[in-house]
């Protein structure tokens, strides 16, 4: 099982918009060295919405190859058409991912019945463990705990990434889904409390730029060391809001580039690079977190 501090990795790109595999390899090595517990490849932060299926699968496969068994890789397999999600799932099933992360279908706003049918179909297309992903702020559909509970009986659905920031859902999900169902926070600002309330891990945006500090916070929270968790959070919590001054992954990709971890900050349309007005704000937050900028 996958626990702890998990990075929602950015997908580095060359100036022409193609994937920068050299920088991708460097990012994988960086997170292994920093102690990150797992990597999500081509999720929301990895620009899954603008990578066609063939390229999407190729990026996940290369991430697995670069990791070479040293860190678990979770492949994003979400789409707003069930047939497309099944296609991605089948394509990712043979590349060596430890699990897959599937966001709720976005824009078309399925009912709970539709969500259950969608995830049932996706899970049936593979033996690889599946993690559900609820982020209504981006998808316009909220998968409530009672809907999640109806999917627990499917053997390869192992957990959910809950990104509403509503901490009351931790207890509700645990009560409805049982102790073995994995609960991951998808909201950096409430991640420490989420873990303290019984969560198992955090799939994080900020982890891209403060992996060591983020892991320290997660480890302390999971072990019940409230003081150490608060101390680790204090040094980086400013980033939890500043990294969302524009739509994710715009700010974090800019920050990763400023750290010299990727060759440039190219991001695919319709997203554009961080607006100049926010450069100072993000640089100040990075400075306060003692991040070296090149």
Curated annotation (Swiss-Prot):
GO CC annotation: cytosol
Location comes to: Cytoplasm
Reaction catalysed by this enzyme: L-aspartate 4-semialdehyde + pyruvate = (2S,4S)-4-hydroxy-2,3,4,5-tetrahydrodipicolinate + H2O + H(+)
> Residues at site: Part of a proton relay during catalysis?
44, 107
Q: Which domain of life is it from?
A: Bacteria
Its keywords, alphabetically, are: Amino-acid biosynthesis, Cytoplasm, Diaminopimelate biosynthesis, Lyase, Lysine biosynthesis, Schiff base
Q: Which SUPFAM superfamilies match?
A: Aldolase (SSF51569)
Q: In which pathway does it act?
A: Amino-acid biosynthesis; L-lysine biosynthesis via DAP pathway; (S)-tetrahydrodipicolinate from L-aspartate: step 3/4
Q: What is its main location?
A: cytoplasm
Official protein name in the record: 4-hydroxy-tetrahydrodipicolinate synthase
């Amino acid at each position: 099982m996958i626990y702890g501090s998990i990075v929602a990795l950015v997908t580095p790109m060359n100036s022409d918009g193609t994937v920068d595999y050299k920088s991708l390899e460097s990012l994988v090595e960086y997170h292994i060295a920093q102690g990150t517990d797992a990597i999500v490849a081509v999720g929301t932060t990895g620009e899954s919405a603008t990578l066609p299926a063939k390229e999407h699968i190729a990026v996940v496969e290369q991430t697995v190859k670069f990791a070479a068994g040293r860190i678990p890789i979770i492949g994003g397999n979400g789409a707003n058409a069930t047939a497309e999600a099944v296609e991605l799932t089948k394509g990712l099933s043979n590349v060596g991912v430890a699990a897959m992360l599937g966001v709720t279908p976005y824009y078309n706003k399925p009912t709970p019945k539709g969500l259950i049918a969608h995830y049932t179909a996706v899970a049936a297309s593979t033996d690889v463990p599946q993690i559900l992903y609820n982020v209504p702020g981006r998808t316009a559909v909220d998968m409530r705990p009672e809907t999640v509970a109806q999917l627990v009986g499917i053997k390869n659905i192992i957990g959910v990434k809950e990104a509403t920031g509503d901490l009351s859902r931790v207890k509700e999900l645990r009560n409805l889904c049982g102790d073995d169902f994995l609960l991951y926070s998808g909201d950096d600002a409430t991640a420490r409390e989420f873990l303290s309330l019984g969560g198992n891990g955090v799939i994080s945006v900020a982890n891209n730029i403060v992996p060591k500090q983020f892991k320290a916070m997660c480890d302390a929270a999971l072990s019940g060391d409230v003081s150490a968790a608060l101390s680790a959070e204090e040094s980086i919590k400013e980033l939890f809001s500043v990294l969302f001054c524009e739509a994710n992954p715009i700010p974090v990709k800019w920050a990763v580039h400023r750290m010299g971890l990727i060759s440039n900050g190219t991001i695919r349309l319709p997203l554009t690079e961080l607006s100049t007005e926010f450069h100072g704000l993000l640089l100040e937050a990075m400075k306060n977190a003692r991040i070296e900028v090149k």
